[in-house]
Amino acid sequence: MASSREIRNKIKSIKNTQKITRAMEMVAASKMRKAQDRMKKARPYGEKIRNVAAHMSKASVEYRHPFLIDRNSVKRVGIIVVTSDKGLCGGLNTNVLRRALNEIRVWGAEGEQIEVCCIGNKGLGFMSRLGVRVISQVTGLGDAPNMEKLIGAVKVVLDAYTDDHFDRVYIFYNRFVNTMKQIPVMEQLLPLTDEHMRDDGNEAKPARAPWDYIYEPEAKPVIDDIMIRYIEALVYQAVAENMASEQSARMVAMKAASDNAGNLIDELTLIYNKSRQAAITKELSEIVGGAAAV
């Protein structure tokens, strides 16, 4: 059995650790609320630009954007993997990376070549160790998604698809459900599907004539810009959801760590009291035995 001094030192060390985890829990709770607000505020813009993109895709008969054209055969796949820059958030990154790894193995078995864009340091490190070719990366986003930092890496993927280097593009991230639940998901980013191009504003309305736009000087540059902005909005929303998931998972992980530290302190305190009691009993026995011998 450890000495009383060793047990006291362990209790002191665990209490110091508990103070740190409680502080991190409170910080994560504050950041989680802000991340959830950013995630909710990003949704109206995403919905609106989706409706505009849907209108234009149905209205323009003289030009069809490459993002809307399905490829018959799939030989190259580009993926965007969204993870956090930091750890201490439970199994959040592990779950989404495991999901991506499973799909990479399936595509590899089918003879498809994989290239990846990494958003977040954890995903970048994992893909580098895995040996997958990383064509673009974004790290150091901080606590808020920054579109200016994301645009460059996303543009590399979009240009590769436009140049027929990719036949499919997917994105992996953690979808925020609630504080206690985050789900790793895979979504097809390109080509855009009917689900992407649905117009929520017209779902419950009677059929009417197709949308009619007059483009000056021509349709192509306008539609090109709208489609790129729509994809950027989808990526931004995924990053915002992943950040909200990250802070929620970190808060839950730190709370669990604080609770476990408390339980360990209680156990060590009980052991310390037993050890102290045994030492006192032994000392009294020695005194009584000495007195009896005299």
From Swiss-Prot:
CDD domains the UniProt entry points to: F1-ATPase_gamma
GO cellular component: plasma membrane; proton-transporting ATP synthase complex
A biological process term (GO) from this entry: proton motive force-driven plasma membrane ATP synthesis
Keywords noted in UniProt: ATP synthesis, Cell inner membrane, Cell membrane, CF(1), Hydrogen ion transport, Ion transport, Membrane, Transport
Keyword flag rRNA processing: no
Highest taxon of source: Bacteria
Membrane topology: Peripheral membrane protein
Alphabetical list of InterPro entries matching this protein: ATP_synth_F1_ATPase_gsu (IPR035968), ATP_synth_F1_gsu (IPR000131), ATP_synth_F1_gsu_CS (IPR023632)
Compartment(s) where it occurs, according to its Swiss-Prot or TrEMBL record: Cell inner membrane
Main location: membrane
Keyword Signal: no
GO molecular function: ATP binding; proton-transporting ATP synthase activity, rotational mechanism
Protein role: Produces ATP from ADP in the presence of a proton gradient across the membrane. The gamma chain is believed to be important in regulating ATPase activity and the flow of protons through the CF(0) complex.
Family of this protein: Belongs to the ATPase gamma chain family.
Subunit relationships: F-type ATPases have 2 components, CF(1) - the catalytic core - and CF(0) - the membrane proton channel. CF(1) has five subunits: alpha(3), beta(3), gamma(1), delta(1), epsilon(1). CF(0) has three main subunits: a, b and c.
Record-linked HAMAP family: ATP_synth_gamma_bact
Protein name: ATP synthase gamma chain
Organism: Nitrosomonas eutropha (strain DSM 101675 / C91 / Nm57)
